[in-house]
Each structure stands twice: as structure tokens, then as C-alpha cells.
């Protein structure tokens, strides 16, 4: 062997400790090192025998069964009603085997339920034994499952409206019917609605405060517990069905969770409820107070004014607006209640119908007196000034030319009739049917506010009474019985003399017939039996059918605008007097006033 490498040994030290290892070339052989490491003195450390598979399928089945059983138990504990546990054993109810789930605030509502989310959330669950009280409710259930519990409770109720009424009174301390009046129909429209909505999500309730502003002029919202109260004054009237459709889509609730009625508008207690509730911190309001709340709660100069009904103001209003019918007066004046204090006082009166009848009678008296004071020229001028728009008089001239009527002769006859020339104040339009006789005369009567007489009422002795209330009259479609009646009783009236006219509830009055228009299919001038009427009636024949366009509209439009242009254009030819000559030196006259002046009225 080679000499050992390293330092030279010293005497006296080699027997005590070996400080250097002996090197050998054999240790540098890698194959020998690997062979030495693989050799082991431990026997049977590795089992090199052949393995048997065994029953692995049965083991896998047992593991799956155990896992399914655990999942089933967890689902039973989650969805099992507490009442069912109490029925089995009261002691079992006080023990909770499943761990309590931690309260988490979730971002998406759709993760509130489901097997996958439940198993995932249970990884952060701490095991504990819980003994809750019977009336207590877990925090997580109060935060996340309150809406579902309220809704299920409502569905289980046999009378959901009664439940909602009771819940409302429990939370707000006042009955729902104390604030509202009942509408039985779902199609009745109203601008203001009171809604009580049960179990609304807080986020949807907050969002509705902004979304409703585009639909309403005034919003009042307050939520207490699971009940939310709305007072909505819409910009346009809505019925109950429309309101429910809007709220169910906006609040994501079922229609059974909503009760709605219009508010009480004349109840001071109800108005104070809304007024005081708006001042509280828990209510949300938008817009100014409605008039029916402000008038009953806010003290101001308007509320201090006298609320006595002034009939003369109502008469003046009806006179200025040309309302003569009782139904029109009552309906139109009631619509003024939000703006006129006198209309409010009239609505609050117990004798509304009597006042309406008296107002209509007074307006008719004033209108009749005004008409009698006017001449025919002034009457025509007043009537055509009320016509809006412009037309062309040539339409009437073309129609007369189409019917082969001499326009100059017609103007002369019309002038005599308007001036009530004796034996010249009656014009007859005769001809075959469908020639436009009634259309022509009716259009003239309409623009001059004349009256139409029907011979069907001739059995009554008052059928000629409208002649005393107009400047021009029309008897349409005169037949043989009517000609006989006129030939027998109306000769003096057609002559322009004063006659005795019997009026209802009055003594016979002395008057003259107004300008009279007649239409008939009979040419009275060819009838010998009516020869005494020939000199009293001026007749014009309409032989041609009335022309119509392809769209079934008249070829000649006989409108108020056409007659306005006709009288304006031919004013001098008809010898109608100038309106400035009829006034007092051309001075403007004050309009008719039938109501007492107020103390602060302008002169």
C-alpha cells in the first residue's frame, strides 16, 4: 500500500487522539459507495411480495354513503321547522347539534340559499351548543330572512287584508281606514293614493324615494318595522291597478302585500297625521304640501278669510263663461274648488242643488235681458267675435251658386229678414232630400245662437216659447200638418205684428216673432191650399244633391268661420249698423257685472 498522506505524527500524541483520518483510494470509488449505501442490516423493511386488490368498491360506497348522510342531516337541521322539534320533545329544542353559522353580509341576494353556498359557508363555522328562547330570533335570520318569514306568514293567513290592517295599526298606532276613504272599483282614478306595503327590502325602499319623484308632485314615505307607509300625489290621475303595477315592479313585492286607498281630503285629523309625520326624522318627504293638507293645517291669510258662500260670484262666473245648463254649472264650478274659495264654500254647503238652480235661472234672465237690449247688428257682431279662427265667405257663395240660387236675391231676402221687415222676415229653403237644406240653415242658426223648434211638440201650447228667447229661429222639415198649423195660427206672426205668446209658468206675453228660417220638401208657392202664406214667405230652391268628397267629407264646409267671414265681408251690403255709432260717442263700455264689488277691487 502507499504511504499514508498527511502530517507527520508527533510523539506523545498519537496514543491519546487521532486528529487526522486515513485516506484510501478505495473510498473514492463511486460504485463501491453506492453498493455500500444500498446494503441494509434491517430485514423486511420493504414488502416485495405480491399485493391483493381487496374490496375497494365497497369502501368507496361506504365513504359516499357517509358523506351523503352528513349532507342530509345538515339540510334537515337547516329547513326543519322549530315547531316540529318542539312537538317531538321540548328538551330536544334546547339542544343544537349543528354549528351556528356566522353572520356575513353578502353582496348578492341570490347567494342567500342553495346547497353549494351552504356547504361553502360552513367551513367557517364554530361548533357550539345553543339553548335559545322560544321567542328569540337569530341575528342572521333577522338580517337576511326577515322578508321571507313575513311573506310566508302573510301567505298562511286566510284574510291577508285583515292581517295587514292589524300590522299597520300595531306599527303606526292608527287605523288604515282612519286615514283613507274607500274605493271599491279598481278602475276609479285619483291623483292621491295612500299605500301600506308589508315586508319591503330596505334597499328597494330607499331607491323608491328617488324613482317616485318622476311620477309624483308630493311624496311621503315612512317605514316602521316590516310596514312601510306611502302617501303619493301623482302628477296625473291613476287607478288602483296602475298604482299596484307600478309599486310591485319598483319594490319587488306581491300585490297581496299592498293595501291602497285614496286619502281623506276633508278630515283635519288625517291631515294633521301627514303634517306632523312629515316633521319627524323617520319620514321622507318630497315636494310642497298638497292643498288639502295645507288648507287644514297651515294657518295663513287664506284660512282667515271669510268662508261664506257668495252666490253673486257664482252667477258672475256662469254668466262670463256662458253656462246656462244646470249640469254644466254644477260640474264646472266644482272643478274650480282647488283654486276658488267660493267654490269650496259652495261644496261645503248643504243646499248645493238649490243654488245651482237659482244660478242657472239668474244667468238665463241676464242673458235674455242682454239679448233684448241688443239690436240685430250688435247681436251678430257679438256672436261672430266669439268665433275663433278664420274662414272664407266664398264657400257659402259657391254653395248657393251650386244650388242655382241667385246670390243677389238671397242677400236681399236675408237683409229683409234680419231687419224684421213686415212680411219679409221668413225664408223658406225647399227641395228634394239630401240637398243640404238642413246643413245650410243649421250652420247659420249655430253661429247666431238661434233656437230650433220641432213640430213634434205642437200638442203643447208652449212649443213656440223658444221664439221669445232668441234673435233667429228655425223650424226644420216642415210637413203638411205644420203648414196647416202655420196657415191657421201663425199668419199674424209672419206678418211681423205683435202676437200673444203663451209661456210656461207665466202669463201670455206680448212679443214679435224673430227672424224665422224654414226647410221643407214642399214648395209652398205651388200649393193652392196655402195661398195666404205665399206673400209672407220668401222661398229658395235647392235642387242639387249635396256634394261629398272621396273621403266622405263635405265639398262645401259651412262652418262658423265661413259665416264669420260672410258677415264681415258683406256687412255693408246687409245694411248692418256700425258698432261705433251704437255706442256712446265711441267710448268703451264696462262689461256686465252682476256681483257686488269687493273692497279692494280696481276701478
Swiss-Prot record:
- Residues with Phosphoserine modification: 81, 89
Return the GO cellular component terms, semicolon-separated: host cell nucleus
Q: Where in the cell is it found?
A: Host nucleus
Which InterPro entries does the annotation name? Helicase_SF3_DNA-vir, P-loop_NTPase, PPV_DNA_helicase_E1_C, PPV_DNA_helicase_E1_N, PPV_E1_DBD, PPV_E1_DBD_sf, Rep_E1_papillomaV, Znf_lg_T-Ag_D1_dom_sf
> Motif location (Nuclear export signal)?
88-97
The residues that cross the membrane are none
Q: Which domain of life is it from?
A: Viruses
Bias (Basic and acidic residues): 58-68
Question: According to its UniProt record, where is this protein mainly located?
Answer: host cell
| The EC number(s) this enzyme carries | 5.6.2.4
- Region: Disordered; residue ranges are 47-68, 578-603
Stretches the record annotates as DNA-binding region = 143-306
- Domain SF3 helicase, residue spans: 405-555
Quaternary form?
Can form hexamers. Interacts with E2 protein; this interaction increases E1 DNA binding specificity. Interacts with host DNA polymerase subunit POLA2. Interacts with host single stranded DNA-binding protein RPA1. Interacts with host TOP1; this interaction stimulates the enzymatic activity of TOP1.
Question: To which protein family does this belong?
Answer: Belongs to the papillomaviridae E1 protein family.
What name is this protein filed under?
A: Replication protein E1
Per the UniProt record, the source organism is: Human papillomavirus 21
